[in-house]
């Protein structure tokens, strides 16, 4: 089959005023990834597929995010908001370069899939000049209705203009569209603004195609996939749908989720085989969990890798830059950041490990702190393989604890400890025999009321 070229234009110029936020609407996250990023990830990616994003003025943050996600993408500014067709023509320069297929999508529909983009293109290869994505709405009120005659799309009728019979139609316009790229620019240029708002509506392209005797088609998807995000409530609804998808995909791949509805995943979370995630775990962006690992309840993991057969939690926090080796253990109330913890090492309780490397098989006692920040700079702590750090120790970085070395409980270590050595830093213990009894007796006498 001959390879066909495509240009996808993603409209992302909306202010999102109903979000009540200074953050551009398309940069709000779902499953740890901006709305726009989900759409760009789903859009065609091949060598013959181009991408353009239309942004609003003063939305440099959106342009920057676009380049981060898809360095190949171009951005164009829609200086005035005069309707969807006007927005598409902001990328006129890209359209004019030519492509077999022009795809138009929206930056606030994070649930759209790559499969839907592929299905949208198929009718163009079979003779259609325009394809509209539709969905069966549970409540079609407010949506444009797709009027179908036989197997062709006859019109998109807005709610205010629909007849009584047309209002009964539940097949609604999702806004996503594909146009034969050879005629796309000519059709878009023909769209006028003779309406109450004086705007240029992309939906008018259907009528133009019909006037030219060209075929317009509809493909359907489920309503969830084309949810647009305009409010924080809709953002939360999309998050819920996305989480259900991610959990289902994880379980299908063999991950055990205990009470899946309580577990939060990120869009880019990667799992190995036979992973178990207990209740109330939050996994943020940039996390990979290898075969056989167990994440216990109430743990929070972001930007970290967990090795095979490792154990995390309960009540553990793994921050960005944490790398947990095979069979290593992070226990309850432990926080790690920018830390490499090698295979078999144990950090079991009440500990902070930051900017550190813990060698294979080392044991870190309860209450140990790596003191990594001096108020200006971060410093590293190196703990050798097989080392033992006693409870309630403070390791003042930069410092190195050698292979097989011991640190006595309660020590404040400020100097390097050689291999197989013992470091103890604390005052000699003083014992005063009978002192406690005398103290109680003296205190009791002092509390007796004085007689007048």
From Swiss-Prot:
Segments of this protein annotated with the region Pyrophosphorylase: 1-232
Region called Linker, residue ranges: 233-253
Enzyme class, broadest EC rank: transferase
PROSITE patterns, alphabetized: HEXAPEP_TRANSFERASES
Pfam family, one: NTP_transf_3
Main localisation: cytoplasm
Alphabetized PANTHER family for the sequence: BIFUNCTIONAL PROTEIN GLMU (PTHR43584:SF3), NUCLEOTIDYL TRANSFERASE (PTHR43584)
Assembly and binders: Homotrimer.
Job description of the protein: Catalyzes the last two sequential reactions in the de novo biosynthetic pathway for UDP-N-acetylglucosamine (UDP-GlcNAc). The C-terminal domain catalyzes the transfer of acetyl group from acetyl coenzyme A to glucosamine-1-phosphate (GlcN-1-P) to produce N-acetylglucosamine-1-phosphate (GlcNAc-1-P), which is converted into UDP-GlcNAc by the transfer of uridine 5-monophosphate (from uridine 5-triphosphate), a reaction catalyzed by the N-terminal domain.
Protein name: Bifunctional protein GlmU
Organism per entry: Rhodopseudomonas palustris (strain BisB5)
Gene (UniProt): glmU
């Amino acid at each position: 089959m001959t390879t066909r070229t495509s240009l996808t234009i993603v409209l992302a110029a909306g202010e999102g005023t109903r979000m009540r936020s200074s953050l551009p609407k398309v940069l709000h996250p779902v499953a740890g990834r901006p709305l726009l990023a989900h759409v760009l990830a789903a859009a065609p990616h091949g060598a013959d597929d181009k991408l353009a994003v239309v942004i609003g003025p003063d939305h440099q943050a959106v342009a920057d995010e676009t380049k981060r996600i898809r360095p190949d993408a171009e951005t164009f500014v829609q200086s005035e908001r005069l309707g969807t067709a006007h927005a598409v023509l902001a990328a006129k320069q890209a359209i004019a370069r030519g492509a077999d297929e022009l795809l138009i999508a929206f930056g606030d529909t994070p649930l759209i899939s790559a499969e839907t983009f592929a299905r949208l293109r198929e009718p163009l290869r079979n003779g259609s000049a325009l394809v509209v994505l539709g969905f069966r709405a549970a409540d079609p009120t407010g949506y444009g209705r797709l009027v179908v005659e036989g197997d062709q799309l006859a019109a998109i009728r807005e709610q205010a203009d629909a007849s009584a019979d047309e209002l009964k139609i539940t097949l609604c316009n999702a806004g996503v569209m594909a146009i034969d790229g050879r005629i796309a620019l000519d059709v878009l240029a023909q769209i006028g603004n003779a309406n109450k708002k004086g705007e240029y509506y992309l939906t008018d392209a259907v009528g133009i195609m019909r006037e030219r005797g060209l075929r317009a088609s509809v493909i359907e998807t489920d309503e969830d996939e084309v949810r647009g995000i305009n409010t924080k409530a809709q953002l939360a609804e999309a998050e819920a749908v996305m989480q259900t998808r991610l959990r289902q995909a994880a379980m299908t791949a063999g991950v055990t989720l205990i009470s899946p509805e309580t577990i939060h995943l990120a869009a880019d979370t990667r799992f190995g085989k036979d992973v178990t995630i207990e209740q109330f775990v939050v996994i943020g962006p940039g996390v990979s969990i290898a075969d056989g690992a167990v994440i216990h309840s109430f743990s929070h993991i972001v930007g970290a890798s967990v090795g095979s057969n490792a154990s995390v939690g309960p009540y553990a926090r793994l921050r960005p830059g944490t790398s947990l080796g095979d069979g290593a253990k992070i226990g309850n109330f432990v926080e790690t950041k920018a830390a490499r913890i090698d295979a078999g090492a144990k950090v079991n309780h009440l500990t902070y490990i930051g900017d550190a490397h813990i060698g294979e098989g080392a044991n870190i006692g309860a209450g140990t702190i790596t003191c990594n920040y001096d108020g200006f700079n971060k410093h590293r702590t190196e703990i050798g393989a097989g080392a033992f750090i006693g409870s309630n120790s403070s390791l003042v970085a930069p410092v190195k604890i050698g292979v097989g070395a011991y640190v006595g409980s309660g020590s404040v270590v400020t100097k390097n400890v050689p291999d197989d050595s013992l470091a103890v830093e604390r005052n000699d213990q003083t014992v005063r025999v009978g002192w406690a009894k005398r103290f109680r007796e003296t205190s009791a006498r002092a509390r007796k009321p004085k007689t007048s």
